């Protein structure tokens, strides 16, 4: 699962609960058989905030966005008992982004997420040790012939993995095909990026404290 951009204390509480649930699942695994299992394995957490860009916040609450902070990031890792596997940042929003990446990269995978970074800034972040792109094309700089942005930097860095949403709504199928040609299937990760209203009737729902209206498949 992925966390939203929420107050730091609330995120810590969520991460502690997730760690407790993980331990409970491990205890259950010891007594149930493979045929009894009716749930997915909880393998880790993807944090899409709060170190993101207010310009590319998408459905995140701007009030809770903060610059990269190693102390706070360590609190997240500790609260989750290191269940956090991906930590998203917008490198252009923090003067210390490169040092943050270098100091944290051996503890957690650093993603570029909800970012308005230029090609040069994204390239620098990836060379510093970031290795993952959150939902390619969505909530990031555009990909054009003069300003290739985050997509161009990800394409150029062969050590970078990129998520992509293949629901036919977030990205045009032509761009999905183009991404696979640029980066190869081995570097692409299919994600749903779905919320709890997925599969529910049209209506009003909430996402990270924000009101969301569902109409059809949007």
Segments predicted by a language model, with ranges:
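Histidine/acidic-residue-rich, glycine-tolerant segments that coordinate divalent metal ions
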Residues: 6-148, 199
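Ser/Thr-centric signal marking residues that sit
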Residues: 1-5, 115, 192
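Conserved strand-turn element in the central/C-terminal portion of the radical SAM core barrel
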Residues: 2-8, 89, 162-167
């Amino acid at each position: 699962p992925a966390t939203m951009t929420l107050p730091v204390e609330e995120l810590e509480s969520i991460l502690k609960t997730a760690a407790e649930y993980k331990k409970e699942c491990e205890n259950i695994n010891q007594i149930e058989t493979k045929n009894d299992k009716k749930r997915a394995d909880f393998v880790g957490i993807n944090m899409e905030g709060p170190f993101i860009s207010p310009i590319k916040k998408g459905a995140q609450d701007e009030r809770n966005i903060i610059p990269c902070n190693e102390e706070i990031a360590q609190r997240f890792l500790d609260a989750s008992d290191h269940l956090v596997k991906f930590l998203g940042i917008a490198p252009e929003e923090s003067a210390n982004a490169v040092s943050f990446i270098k100091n944290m990269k051996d503890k957690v995978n650093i993603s570029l997420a909800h970012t308005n970074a230029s090609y040069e800034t994204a390239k620098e972040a990836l060379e510093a040790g970031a290795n993952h792109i959150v939902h390619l094309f969505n909530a990031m700089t555009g990909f054009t012939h003069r300003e290739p942005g985050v997509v161009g930097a990800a394409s150029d860095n062969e050590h970078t993995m990129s998520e992509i949403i293949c629901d036919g709504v977030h990205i045009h199928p032509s761009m999905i095909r183009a991404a696979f040609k640029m980066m190869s299937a081995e570097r692409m990760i299919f994600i749903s990026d779905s919320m709890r209203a997925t599969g529910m009737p049209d209506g009003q729902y909430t996402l990270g404290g924000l009101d969301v209206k569902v109409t059809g498949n949007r």
